[in-house]
């Protein structure tokens, strides 16, 4: 492993598969590569993979407990980030936009109230050098 590991896929449990597939294909422009009655594999042109698995309408998700809190996605341009923000607003899923001199982040919530954050200038262009203060607010 001379170059270290890289993220391969993200698995997210959701309440309603159709609703979540619609959200992620619309907001992040992912495409459905495979699908069953209870799961879907969504992929991006860059190779990012999101696996959604339906857990039913009563499945809880609590922010702040042990486990992955959310995934931060990165786009290639400010125009792409603006498009993500617009789609989040159209879906009434937009929460806020924050920026620094290096990175701008748009935050929304998916249909299961899971945080979705999208940044322009991802880690390949603007790697983190310090811990983000936001992690202490959960």
Where are these regions (language model features)?
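Conserved short beta-strand elements that form part of the metal-binding/catalytic scaffold
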Residues: 31-66, 109, 115-122
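Short N-terminal helix-initiation segments at or just after the protein's N-terminus
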Residues: 9-21, 49-57, 82
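N-terminal beta-strand motif that seeds the catalytic metal site of vicinal oxygen chelate
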Residues: 1-18, 70-71, 125-138
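Conserved active-site tyrosine of GNAT-family acetyltransferases
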Residues: 20-25, 113
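Short helix-capping and inter-helix turn/linker motifs at the boundaries of alpha-helical repeat units
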Residues: 1, 61-62, 96
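Vicinal oxygen chelate
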Residues: 6-15, 61-87, 90-138
């Amino acid at each position: 492993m001379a170059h270290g590991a890289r993220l391969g896929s993200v698995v997210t449990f959701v309440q309603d598969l159709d609703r979540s597939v619609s959200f992620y294909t619309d907001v992040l422009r992912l495409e459905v590569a495979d699908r069953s009655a209870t799961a879907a594999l969504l992929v991006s042109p860059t190779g990012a993979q999101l696996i959604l698995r339906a857990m039913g309408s009563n499945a809880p998700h609590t922010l702040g407990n042990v486990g992955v809190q959310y995934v931060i996605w990165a786009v290639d341009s400010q125009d792409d980030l603006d498009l993500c923000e617009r789609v989040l607003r159209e879906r009434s899923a937009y929460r806020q936009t924050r920026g620094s001199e290096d990175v701008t982040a748009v935050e929304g919530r998916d249909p299961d109230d899971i945080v979705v954050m999208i940044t322009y200038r991802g880690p390949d262009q603007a790697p983190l050098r310090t811990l983000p203060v936001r992690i202490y607010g959960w």
